[in-house]
Amino acid sequence: MMSKHIFQKEPVLSIATCLAIISAFFVPPDAEYLGYIDFRTLAILFSLMTVMAGLRGQGVFDRLGHALLSHTRTTLQLTAVLVGLCFFSSMLITNDVSLLTFVPFTFVVLNSLNASVRSKLLLPIVCMQTIAANLGSMLTPLGNPQNLYLYGKSGMDMSAFVLLMLPYSIISLVLIAIWAVWLCREGSAIVVTHSAVNSEPDKKLIALYGILFVACLLVVLRVLPYGVAFAAILVCAFFADRPTLGRVDYSLILTFVALFIFIGNLGRIEAFSGWLQNVLAGHEVFVSVLASQVTSNVPAAILLSGFTDNFRALIIGTNLGGLGTLIASMASLISYRQIANEVPAEKGHYFAMFTISNVVFLAILMGAWAMT
């Protein structure tokens, strides 16, 4: 019964752990296992999640949302703010944190509107917030876990990474803008009422996390050793804001560890290694998009990176592959759970809307890739 509960709560971690254990029967544990683990990626991931949890705990992102909403007067402006927050913020705070913050915020804001406007906007906005967070996050190495991993693995510099994904980000932004105008084609004036964030933020903590975020950026840019930033963030959080350490997504870190072990073992099984290298050769984008649909894009990135050096193609493929099925990007489940909890009668409608919208966006972006 407990194992079923764990699987339902953490399906990706559960599957990754099972795969790691099964692979250990074919490649018994030895000293080489330690070499599988990318400690730099894990340290940066922990550091970023801790800093984001700290800033979120201080209501920084909620206050940003409230400030922007104070200028909205129409449904189009409201939609642009709520969806734009997810698109642009995900570039720096990750798609997960963006959705964890702004989807609940959206429920609060829309609840202040009349029932007809709320019912018209709720599902489309949450659906597009999810797509926007996934697509906005693809522009930077900080945007999502697979980017962070592949950026470190590839040895690319920041500018090369951004330039690689910039065309897809621009196309995505244009598509989202067109969608917003279409949704609000019968736009009407609205009055948004929303309660201010109650608790006063700790300005010293916000300043501290701001400094620590800069440290994270310096690590990503390979200016600062990851061990220094990791130690500083761990010590600062432990002594200055200990509850934040409890809000870190440790299951994601453990998922990475399990996948590192699984991929490391597969690489030592010659028959499988040779087969996958042949499948990938020249088809990295297409294969990574397909793999993301069934495993989600983080496991797909880690799996495929062990069998090709074409990291540019993997970066494109796993980012575009975050579109499509509900599990293509695990961040998408955050929004789905919010819908299922808040308006359970609408979750089927949301799922259909989400799937159709994702397939359309994926088809257009894959078409753009095919023309490059």
List the predicted regions and their residue ranges.
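Membrane-interfacial loop-to-helix junctions in multi-pass transporters
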Residues: 39-41, 70-83, 113-125, 203-207, ...
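Transmembrane helical segments that form the transport core of multi-pass membrane transport proteins
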Residues: 36, 58, 62-65, 211-309
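Interfacial loop-to-helix junctions that mark the boundaries of transmembrane helices
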Residues: 3-9, 31-41, 156-168, 198-203, ...
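Cytoplasmic-side transmembrane-helix entry/capping segments in multi-pass membrane proteins
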Residues: 9-14, 39-40, 66-79, 121-131, ...
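Flexible interhelical linker loops that connect adjacent transmembrane helices
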Residues: 2, 66, 183-210, 239-246
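Membrane-core helix-loop-helix motifs of multi-pass transport proteins
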Residues: 117-184, 190-194, 336-365
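C-terminal transmembrane helix pair
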Residues: 162-173, 286-372
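Hydrophobic transmembrane alpha-helices that form the pore/transport pathway of multi-pass ion
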Residues: 88-138, 302-315, 344-349, 358, ...
